């Protein structure tokens, strides 16, 4: 009896359920309810249903791009729904109080993201997610651990205790290895602190965007104009976010924070590379440094061989010139002139003679 169907269908389904259960357990452990991540508006639900129907047929290269586009559409409906709910709950005639209360709620979402590891910000304010997501993908590709394991790790609670533990000297015949692991932990803690500072910058950017949006709405109210559609509101919200981002990244403080993050990441990568090379060497496998040395030596050998060929051809030409002869062979790098095409031999014209003549 063949078990092909079991391994093709049932086994994959079992694996999917296994990881789904682990995901649900991790979300419950972090205080995240699965219902809170569901669609909050009918338009979001419609977008989700449409994407579920179209996602299997979408190419892999464009699937991530389409997911970002779907998220932008959801943000549009969330923003419109936020202002619409506030208008339904309060007095629609008092427009200034309505806008002020709504912007205060949005600003509280940003300030709350400092305490819950960024989960609140990813709900409505996910437009700042792309730069952080690109950085996390890069770190995940460099790290032996899956994902960015240091993103939400608490730092201030046990920093002093961990520093004291890492300052202990190594003992025994493994003291060198112990010191290397201590340096790795110090580099990891420095990178984690730099990453949290970098994440807080984007949280402050969100709060500044809300302030810019409040100034824009106040100007609209003072001028007596009206906002005709949710699309115009969303376009101005995006413009406020882009303006806040452009102002922030041009400051020396952002350059310092970003430079600290890059330096910490490179130091952590260097420590990881050293430990990986030592483990590979213990297994009698070629390490990264050995492969790099081999590549450098091969390149040097190629250059030396090329220089020797040129010297040999130069000597051949000199010997041939002294002997008054042409060299038997030409350098392989010499350009050859195209040989002229041989002409076909001319055919003799024969004239017929008349027998009478």
From Swiss-Prot:
- Where is the protein found, in the record's own terms? Cytoplasm
Does the UniProt entry include the keyword Cytoplasm?
yes
For biological process, the GO terms are: poly-hydroxybutyrate biosynthetic process
Does this UniProt record's set of keywords contain Cytoplasm?
Answer: yes
State the UniProt keywords alphabetically: Cytoplasm, PHB biosynthesis
Predominant localisation class: cytoplasm
Named in its record, the pathway it takes part in is: Biopolymer metabolism; poly-(R)-3-hydroxybutanoate biosynthesis
Query: Mind telling me which Pfam families this protein's record contains?
Result: PHA_synth_III_E
Span list, region Disordered:
320-357
What Gene Ontology cellular component terms go with this record? polyhydroxyalkanoate granule
What pH-dependence text does the entry carry? Optimum pH is 7.8.
Composition bias of kind Low complexity appears in 331-344
State the superkingdom: Bacteria
Protein family: Belongs to the PHA/PHB synthase family. Type III PhaE subfamily.
Question: Briefly, what is this protein's role?
Answer: Polymerizes D(-)-3-hydroxybutyryl-CoA to create polyhydroxybutyrate (PHB) which consists of thousands of hydroxybutyrate molecules linked end to end. This subunit has no catalytic activity but enhances the activity of PhaC, the catalytic subunit, 100-fold.
What does the record note on quaternary structure? A large complex of PhaC and PhaE; the ratio of the subunits has been estimated to be from 1:1 to 4:1, with more PhaE than PhaC.
**Other comments on record:** Poly(3-hydroxyalkanoic acids) (PHA), of which PHB is among the most common compounds, has potential uses as a renewable, biodegradable thermoplastic. PHB serves as an intracellular energy reserve material when cells grow under conditions of nutrient limitation.
Could you identify this protein by its name? Answer: Poly(3-hydroxyalkanoate) polymerase subunit PhaE
List the source organism.
Allochromatium vinosum (strain ATCC 17899 / DSM 180 / NBRC 103801 / NCIMB 10441 / D) (Chromatium vinosum)
Taxon lineage: Bacteria, Pseudomonadati, Pseudomonadota, Gammaproteobacteria, Chromatiales
